[in-house]
Amino acid sequence: HDPERLGAKESGITDYLIYDNYRRASLLDHFFDYNIRLDELMRSEYEEKGDFIGSPYLLERINERQALGVRLSREGLASGNNVKIDKSVSFRKSGIRVDYLIEGRHSGIFATEFNLSFLGSPYPSIHAGGKALFMKDKGAHSGVKSFYIKDEFLNMKLEFSFDEKVDVWHYPIETVSLSEGGVERLYQGTAFLFMKKIDFNGNKRLGFNVSFGEVK
């Protein structure tokens, strides 16, 4: 069907008809070229250099004294080189701890993707790099050691803190739907990518914390 003929609520809405290449989950592992652009990610017009997206990982339960967790591991390829990813996720009262160990050889960008939604509301604010943006905004922040998302309505604050500086990119995930009023865009959530330029032959460690709290 032609959305324009069905009564589109905005012109050019067909530009937003983009089909995802994978399921929108979290802790998704990407390998990109150095020259990847945010708009290419938004439109799914980029080349994935690794084969980890959509592939199964080996799952192992971790029993720690102060937390429960899981370890996920997989051997795959990145730019034609053998790479192994080991990631552990520990669940604590204060939040989540994520640790990565990447072994092999790669020159480019490694990115971890999170997809978040606060009851489908586009109005919680993202505070990163001295800027405040809405969840429905796109943004790219360089050299970030920590950032947080604040939802006044839910009285909730979600903070990410990294062991070393990363670039944080985010953009809205929207669907194009037909309602009684016509064809329109509907906000579903926001994709966050934690980007790290890496050039190694051996191993690389990365880690971050996710903490939960109230708005103060």
Where are these regions (language model features)?
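Long, contiguous hydrophobic alpha-helical segments, chiefly transmembrane helices and signal peptides
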Residues: 22-32, 39-42, 87, 110-116
